Amino acid sequence: MNPAGESPHCCGPSRASDETAAATTGAAPASRHAANSTAGGAGLHAIEQCAVPAGSFLMGDSSGDGLAADGELPLHRVTLETFEIDATPVTNAQFARFADATGYETEAELFGISAVFHLLVEAPTADIAGPTSGTPWWIGVRGADWRHPGGQASSLEGRSEHPVVHVSWHDAMAYCDWADRRLPTEAEWEYAARGGLTAVTFPWGDDPIDGSDGVWRANVWQGSFPAHNTAADGWIGTAPVHSFEPNGYGLWQPVGNVWEWCADRFDPGYYAESPEFDPPGPERGGR
């Protein structure tokens, strides 16, 4: 996800208002679900785990494509203790167990609106609030939430093993509280996503991502962005979490498919001053 501002990155919408982007990030908003009870630690987290060994790596962009405004620079050494991480993102089926057990309502449900990519909107005209500022391919849709990812005319039918979407940082933390889990730090996430490889472009190495060698390795855009997606990899929206091949640590689709939350706040200058050993993330910044 991107920080709010005049120059959004990663093709994501800035949070200009509740009306346009209920589930995106800016300066961390106050949670709207203070009354929700998640019965901390009571949930069944039924996602397989990957053991990630302790080690050191160079964190940040090493290809020259990174953006300082996105907090991808400078390249710096990080050393981590061993930890475990989910092999996949949380699925719709797993998030439904949480919501059904607790009665939890996500922030998108409480706001009554969220941002939907324009090719994926399934909603009556009256529900369309309009494009988000700076990224008009994201449309504010009233009634869009995790149960209705494209809007009120959509559902989770056939999507139980797809990753849950329209989930804010606060929602992710509430799920973790119920499941007796935690979000990974950004350092843990990047280390795990690399799958034990160093000085390569992707979690699988330097082979192309786009199927030019006959093999698709992730769910990414194909075609002319943002107008036409050829869906050459098999998916125009999200893909089931066990699609493609896992990396060296056993993580499925650590790139592509969906954005994923980390525990850290966002501060574009943090890399320049973060500690080498188990960096916890900045004390201040947006989420």
Task: Tell where the protein language model's regions lie, with residue ranges.
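Functional-site microenvironments in short loops/helix caps that host divalent-cation chemistry
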Residues: 10, 14-15, 51-52, 58, ...
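Long, low-complexity intrinsically disordered regions
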Residues: 22-25, 31, 36
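Acidic-aromatic/histidine active-site loop/patch
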Residues: 91
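A short N-terminal beta-strand-loop micro-motif at the entrance of redox/enzyme domains
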Residues: 75-82
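GGW-centered surface loops in extracellular recognition modules
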Residues: 29, 40-46, 50-51
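C-terminal, low-complexity/hydrophilic appendages and adjacent surface loops
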Residues: 64-73
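Histidine-centered metal-binding segments
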Residues: 2-23
